[in-house]
A protein has these predicted regions:
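Surface-exposed ligand/attachment interfaces on beta-rich extracellular proteins
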Residues: 9-28, 49-52, 81-94, 110-111
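Repetitive beta-strand solenoid architecture
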Residues: 7, 28, 37-39, 62, ...
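Short, solvent-exposed coil/turn segments at beta-strand boundaries
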Residues: 27-30, 101
Length: 182
């Protein structure tokens, strides 16, 4: 039997015969544990998922550990504010994010820069444009109202997901927790 280490907060979602979506979850592990209480539920995971009866089923008598794939996270060295936000990564590191991924930014001591679950619209890894060798990505997030200067100490960008659940007919709850499996 595998040992599970919980990571982050445990979310609960009320389930019914229509799809219900969680808040954004900043991905910190490669697995999520789903527990269906009272009624089994179908689960979809993604950027903005809608659960259908064709999706993964979690029984009310057993939990499920679902793989999220590799954790996507990267240190941020600069943020260019505007109608779209441009994020610069450290030189030589590249981007673990692709166009269409949802991401969340955390900047310690400068929360006006923080955003949650915004979509990557472009990835630019062109080297030596004006002596610039870093990878840049563009995010569909309007940061033009941010007035604080950017201090990159500890700033990080993380892939984020949402979990959608639904039952066939009965109501219940689903508990969602990121876990490390060993």
């Amino acid at each position: 039997m595998a040992a599970l280490k919980p990571v982050g907060v445990n979310l609960n979602i009320t389930t019914s015969a229509t799809s219900a979506q969680s808040a954004a979850i900043a991905q910190q592990t490669d697995s999520v544990r789903i527990v269906a209480e009272t009624a089994g539920c179908h689960v979809a995971i993604g950027t903005n998922p809608t659960a259908t009866t064709a999706d993964f089923y979690v029984s009310p008598t057993d939990d499920a550990i679902i793989s999220l794939g590799p954790v996507g996270s990267q240190r941020v060295v600069n943020v260019t504010k505007g109608a779209s936000t441009v994020i610069d990564f450290p030189e030589g590191t590249g981007s673990p994010f692709a166009v269409g991924d949802a991401v969340s930014l955390t900047v310690p001591n400068a929360s006006t820069y923080d955003f949650e679950h915004k979509i990557v619209t472009a990835v630019d890894s062109t080297s030596n444009v004006g002596g610039f060798y870093n990878t840049r990505i563009t995010i569909d997030h309007d940061s033009s109202s941010v007035t604080a200067g950017f201090n990159n100490a500890g700033a990080s960008l993380r892939r984020s997901i949402k979990v959608a659940v639904r039952t066939v007919s009965a109501a219940g709850k689903a508990y969602v927790q990121q876990v490390q499996v060993s």
